[in-house]
Amino acid sequence: MAAEQLNGYVLHRRAYRETSFLVNIFTLENGKVSAVVKGVRGSKSDKKSLLQPFQPLLIGVSGRSELKNLQQVESTGAMIRLAGQALYCALYLNEVLNRVLADEIPHPEIFVLYQQSMHALVAQTNFEPVLRSFELGLLDALGYGIDLTHDADTGQPVADNGYYRIVPELGCVYQGDIRLSGCYSGQSLLNVASENWDKDSLLAAKHITRTTLGELLGSKPLMSRELFKQTHFKSRGREL
C-alpha cells in the first residue's frame, strides 16, 4: 500500500516497546494522526531527529487502522524556534490539541489557527492574547463557541453597561446593572467577542475558555500548565 502524504506537526511523542515511538501528529489533511515509528529509539536516524515539536513536516503513513505506520518523514521548513515563556505556551497548545482532537477528523481551520498562533508566539512578548484567541477559535471550530454578543434568554444584543453570567451550553444571560459575583460586564464580553484585548477582557476570556475547555479536557491536569507553575513565571503572577 502506498504511503499517504500528509503535512503536519508533532503534538506528542513517547517510547513504544524496545525500539519504537508512538507519535501523534496534527495534519492539515486528516487532523490528528497516531502512528508507530519503528526502529528509531537509540539511533541517530533522520526520522528521530525530525520528529520534534514545532517542526513542519511531510510524513508518509500507511495502514487501515487508527494506528498507522509512519514510513517516511521530511522537513518542509525551518523549525519554529521558541524559548522561555513562549515555549511553555506552545507546549500548552500542543497538549490541548492532543487531548481534545479525535483521531482522523480533518480540521483545516484549526491547523491554520495553530500555525498562526505559533508564529505569533515567536513575534510577540505579550502571550496572553495569543492563547485566548487560540482557545476561542478552537472552541468555535469544535462547535463549543459561545455567543458573547447576544443574551441567550432574550436574543437582545449584549448591553455594554449591563452584567452577565455565563451559563454552560447556553451562553450569556443578563443579571442586571449591578455587578454580582461571577458576572462579567457587557463591555468585557463584547471586547472578548471582537478580540479587543484589555485587562478585563483577557480575564473574562480566561475564565470562559477555562470552564468550557475544562469540560473537553477532563479532570487530568495539563502537564504544560504544571510545568509552567514550577518556573519563575509563577513569581510574576502569570499562569497559562
UniProtKB/Swiss-Prot annotation:
It comes from the Bacteria. InterPro entries: ARFGAP/RecO, DNA_rep/recomb_RecO_N, NA-bd_OB-fold, RecO, RecO_C. The keyword DNA damage applies. SUPFAM superfamilies: ArfGap/RecO-like zinc finger, Nucleic acid-binding proteins. Pfam families: RecO_C, RecO_N. GO terms for cellular component: bacterial nucleoid. GO terms for biological process: DNA recombination; double-strand break repair. Keywords: DNA damage, DNA recombination, DNA repair. Involved in DNA repair and RecF pathway recombination. HAMAP family: RecO (MF_00201). Belongs to the RecO family. This is DNA repair protein RecO. It comes from Pseudoalteromonas atlantica (strain T6c / ATCC BAA-1087). The gene is recO.
